[in-house]
Amino acid sequence: MLTSPDGDTAELLAVLNQHLELALPHALALRREVHRHPDLSGAERPTADRLRHALPTLKATRVADTGFLVRIGPPGPAVVIRAELDALPLVEATGVDWAATGTAMHACGHDVHLAALWALLQAARKVDLPVGLIGLFQPREEVQPSGAQSVVGSAVLAEDEVIAVVGAHVQPRVVSGVVSTGMGAVNAAADEFEITIHGHPGHGAYPHIAVDPVPILASIITGMQELVSRTIDPVHPSVITIGRVEAGTAANIIPASGRLSGVIRTMYEQDRSHLHNAIRTLVHHAAAARGATAEVEITTGHPLLVNDRRLVQLTDPLLDHLGIPVAHEPFRSCGADDFSHYAEIAPTLMMFVGVQQDPAAPISPAELNSRSQVGLHHPTFLPSSDAVALVARSLMAGYLAGAQLARH
């Protein structure tokens, strides 16, 4: 059973919520404006300027080249609230009159997150906060090197004692209106790999005097799936996705080389290191057994995204006090988010906010039966306007949980 927040926290929560309600109409308009004018990773300055100009009385500090942060509240310890600035290289197909018209789209909900953080800052400016609140408008979440890596590496937050870093992400796989917190790992570590097999070219009619890299690649592809199913504990989520395979120039030519690339996703650190080593062994043995040579390059990506136990325990009662249901079974996935890097400087909390499609978005009859399956990074993904308020209130609860953490 969730315990009620103490009197002072409950009172501050109520006051913040009142001010938040007043800020929401402008936040909804801002969300549409941001959505209509998306910027790709590394080119987010117009979006950042739009948000910065909507906070005219707050001093902005540039971070990670195209992002910025603002601070309100007392000096000293502060809770950081993160929202992402970048969009995706997609052509939007939502059909709404405020859709983007170019080759970029907010198909991951970042427009919702930005508007929600703006609304929270507007509300928080009007009350006496117990600890500082840093609004971090972060660029380059969708690419590597990521914005979070730049923020952490630059020590831009070192001037303040960071109590916690809080984020929220819309998630269509969570029931609409429900928020999932969940202690421990909630997103996977993700590492990219590229494998090249060097064989010996030849005529397709004479494979015995060539070294064909294609069947070697095929054996590696199936062998990788066996590494997951036969060397990893079955209750440990792990995924190896091979997203690209390249070899050859013509049907009757055995190519000199072939290449494949993909991503390793793991929810346990020991599985991460095991699969790195096992893939290298598998590839080199498969190549050597057939007279070929191999190159294996594994690029370490985002670490596990881990929710701090204390932050979850403090946030859940606040969400409940706001009338927001907390997921009984926490949402976890093998997706990855650069938010995980903030654990290097402070405890972290990522909340997954359940959303549904905006009913105003037209949808074709062919898609009607699969509408509930429209997910992140889809050209028709468009959370309803209610998502802005739900994300903002979730971030508000996360901020107050961080403030309580400072007292413990």
Regions of interest found by a model, annotated:
Residues 2-107, 111-131:
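Acidic/His- and Gly-rich active-site-bordering loop/insert found
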Residues 34, 81, 110, 135, ...:
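Divalent metal-coordination and catalytic microenvironments
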Residues 67-68, 88-90, 95-105, 111-112, ...:
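Histidine/acidic-residue-rich, glycine-tolerant segments that coordinate divalent metal ions
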